[in-house]
Amino acid sequence: SCMSLSLDEAVDMAMKNNPDVLITQLGEEKAKAGLRQARGQNSISWTAGSTFGRSDNNNLGWNNSNNNKISASLPIYSGGVHQNNIKSSELDVDIAKLQTERKWETTQLAVIQAYYDVLEAQKKIGVYQDTVNKYQQHLINVEQLYSAGSKAKVEVLRSEVELSNARQDLIKGKNTYYNNLSTLRNLLYLDSQEPLELTDDFVYIPFAGSIGDCVDFALANRKELLIDSYQLQQKELAVKNAKAGYLPTVDLSLGAGWNKQVLPDGDNHEYSASIGVSWNIFDSGVTAGKVDAANTELKIAQATLQKDKNDIDLSVRKNYNSMREAEERFNSTETAIKQAEEDYFIAQEKYKAGEGIMLDIIDAQEALSTARQNYISAQYDYARYKAALEADMGGTNEPAPIDN
């Protein structure tokens, strides 16, 4: 049986089957676990311990001993370290969510491009096959004219060469199709032998946004830039944590203990409460080194954000310009196909009537094949560049409505 697959179905299948998507989703769970840890470090913690012993002192008999203790501790002041760690962990959760969303976008783009690659290769096989058929028919006509004595042997040989070359293009085109199909199957994690029937095809959807609109939209919505800004905030928190090394820490501790019985009573108990203050007065420059390192990391994060903005700006502009170029190409090549078809028909009829030459047929056929291939390439180039532009912008919606 043959699996029918629309473009939306292909994207959904990739989202379900691609382990890269699962990995980013698991990253969200890891970030949430880290947040729970950070919050726990700023809360009360309980510990309990119990020891049981048995000893014989100078053969006076065995004595049993039992010591029990319960204690609780609570950080009162950490110079803001615990609070900063909680904020940083909350940012980790947001970053993990954005990474998952970006993985969805890049996976969707890869599937869309692979889907259109298959369709393009399939369409071009039709062009190559039509060229082979035309050269095959032309060879038959030349052989008949040669048998009648109206054409030279050299024209038969030239026709055979052109037919052979056309078959080479057909073979290469089929190989491109099979390779593109394998790439699509790989993205969808399908069996490499399962036949596929792609049910969607290119549909021209105008894109009305200007290049400036697209760049602005990308700089506001691109997930990587949002991630960079969150990581920049984390580096700022890390600087505060490093400077907290100059400050004291205060902890509250409570405890209870007893021995020789399971539970304490009025005659057998020990209660304690304490507030501990710790202040690292001199550490031979360790804290200063941590502050310098944190400030350097902050500068790196700032530079990374600026670099990514520049890279995204360039990528958006390239894909936008390439999309517009492809749009102009397929609008112009549609007329070229009709002209090439008419030119080929005229050249063929003139040749049959003995008024044309072999070169006219070859040139007309090559022009027709090229025009058809250019039209196909332009269509799917437009679709691929439009998808790439939308992915570059960080979403599937263009910044301006389509003018009807």
Model-predicted regions and their roles:
Residues 22, 45-65, 73-102, 226, ...:
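Small/polar (Gly/Ser/Thr/Ala-rich) solvent-exposed segments
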Residues 23-38, 103, 107-130, 137, ...:
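Amphipathic alpha-helical coiled-coil segments
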Residues 173, 223, 378:
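Metallo-beta-lactamase
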